[in-house]
Curated annotation (Swiss-Prot):
EC id: 2.1.2.1
Biased composition (Polar residues): 1-11
Sequence similarity: Belongs to the SHMT family.
Protein name as it appears in the record: Serine hydroxymethyltransferase, cytosolic
N-acetylserine modified-residue sites: 2
UniProt-listed GO biological process terms: glycine biosynthetic process from serine; tetrahydrofolate interconversion; tetrahydrofolate metabolic process
Pathway of action: One-carbon metabolism; tetrahydrofolate interconversion
Record flagged with keyword Transferase: yes
Catalytic activity: (6R)-5,10-methylene-5,6,7,8-tetrahydrofolate + glycine + H2O = (6S)-5,6,7,8-tetrahydrofolate + L-serine
Entry-linked CDD domains: SHMT
Disulfide bond residue pairs: none
PROSITE patterns: SHMT (PS00096)
Length: 470
């Protein structure tokens, strides 16, 4: 038997646990666990993943490089990596009720925004046209956001983008105006997806509009993929050409993404009867690798496979049903307290609260909430001019539902947020006119007032009483 060639201290370095080899990093992680354990987490795009997913995520699967796809790698030693990726793909299709003759899926893409860019690059040439929901109206940066003076998303620099919007009176997508604009603009891609739109999308209508202008219909279901997998809201797969999703929001997996693409017949030539087949699989796979990425994160794919298995259980359906109930509890309680909700409510996992009638903005309310251990986010609402000081807050149910909270608990959460709104208004009203900017407000609440401390201590104890998988 050969002797270990390096020093014993080197061996201890490679085999020692984090708490022994890097206590500084270990302490920061412990502090973050404590924050999660004792906070009310309402970020709509966050969730608490499961112990089994953590188990898969922290494995030597991360050691392996595997550029390419199963059966066609650029490195050796990938037999088990291939098995894992194929299993993950199989479970992804099963989770959404799909069959491999009609759908394929790429599970290598690293996150949601890159997944969308990879899709666009696969099916569009530079400067071809795309339409997506405007960011202040509930869309996402990766759907091509730009302002009057500046291209914000890289998507808007590579492609020509035109937003569609909601009706300012109803807060609902204006499909009639979308259709008129699409007919004039003739986009190559129509994106149906949101980050702060609380109502269901009419995928059938979107399909009809896409067909009318000869566009691909790309659905970004990042926020709602868990709800779709559980069958508690309608699925886009009947109508979409391509579907993208992150894996860590309502799906409750590791941080990652997937791209689903159609296989088979796309259309039939009405004159010749000739079938026109989809040509999406190879362009999308090539766009992911080698187009935009190198080797995939195999530990993430393993953890995603585990999350997808969990998504195909009765317990996951029970969870998603409770998410919807808790979101409805938020809707009813905010309405009861006199708050205006964008679109007057929700059909999904979150509510978007307008604060304009309260004479306060989302940035200030977010600041106070953070002081009392509530994590939510300021959010643009239709008609806003600034994304930094927007007129609303976005509040999601998935994370705290994972920890076991029910409708009465979410009603209690509304009372805490109502306290934060009133406290923010009180502080803002006391600021002098020449020093009432957001930075002045933050300075004013930076101290430890007795009122804030009492509420924070109450929330710390209450939130900490619910289980958290770590």
């Amino acid at each position: 038997m050969s002797a270990y060639a390096l020093s014993q201290s080197h061996r201890q370095l490679t085999e020692g646990h984090l708490k022994d080899t890097d206590p500084e990093v270990d302490q920061i992680i412990k502090d973050e666990i404590d924050r999660q354990q004792h906070s009310i987490v309402l970020i709509a795009s966050e969730n608490f993943t499961t112990t089994a997913v953590f188990d898969a995520l922290g494995t030597p699967m991360c050691n392996k490089y595997s550029e390419g796809y199963p059966g066609a790698r650029y490195y050796g030693g990938n037999e088990h990596i291939d098995r894992m990726e194929l299993l993950c793909q199989e479970r992804a299709l099963k989770a959404f009720g799909l069959t491999p003759d009609k759908w394929g899926v790429n599970v290598q893409t690293l996150s949601g925004s890159p997944a969308n860019l990879q899709v666009y690059q696969a099916i569009m040439k530079p400067h071809e046209r795309l339409m997506g929901l405007d960011l202040p109206h509930g869309g996402h940066l990766s759907h091509g956001y730009q302002t009057d003076s500046r291209k914000i998303s890289a998507v808007s620099t590579y492609f020509e983008t035109m937003p569609y919007r909601v009706d300012l009176e109803t807060g609902l997508i204006d499909y009639d105006m979308l259709e008129k604009t699409a007919v004039l603009y003739r986009p190559k891609v129509l994106v149906a997806g949101t980050s702060a739109y609380c109502r269901l999308i009419d995928y059938k209508r979107m399909r009809e509009i896409a067909d009318k202008v000869g566009a691909y219909l790309v659905v970004d279901m990042a926020h709602i993929s868990g709800l779709i997998a559980a069958g508690v809201i309608p699925s886009p797969f009947e109508y979409a050409d391509i579907v993208t999703t992150t894996t860590h929001k309502s799906l409750r997996g590791p941080r990652g993404a997937m791209i689903f693409f159609r296989r088979g017949v796309r259309s039939v030539n009405p004159k010749t009867g000739q079938e026109i087949l989809y040509d999406l699989e190879n362009p999308i796979n090539f766009s992911v690798f080698p187009g935009h990425q190198g080797g995939p994160h195999n530990h993430t794919i393993a953890a995603l496979a585990t999350a997808l298995k969990q998504a195909n259980t009765p317990e996951f359906k029970e969870y998603q049903e409770q998410v919807l109930k808790n979101a409805k509890a938020l809707e009813s309680e905010f309405t009861k307290k006199g708050y205006k909700l964008v679109s007057d409510g929700t059909d999904s996992h979150m509510v978007l609260v307008s604060l304009k009638d309260k004479q306060i903005d989302g940035a200030r309310v977010e600041t106070v909430c953070e002081k009392i251990n509530i994590a939510l986010n300021k959010n643009s609402i239709p008609g806003d001019k600034s994304a930094l000081v927007p007129g609303g807050v976005r509040i999601g149910a998935p994370a705290m539902t994972t920890r076991g909270l029910g409708e009465e608990d979410f009603k209690k959460i509304v009372s805490y947020i109502d306290f934060a709104v009133n406290y923010a208004k009180e502080v803002q009203s006391q600021l002098p006119k020449d020093a009432n900017k957001l930075k002045d407000f933050k300075n004013a609440v930076s101290g430890d007032s007795e009122k804030l401390k009492a509420v924070r201590d109450e929330i710390y104890q209450w939130a900490g009483s619910f289980p958290l998988a770590v």
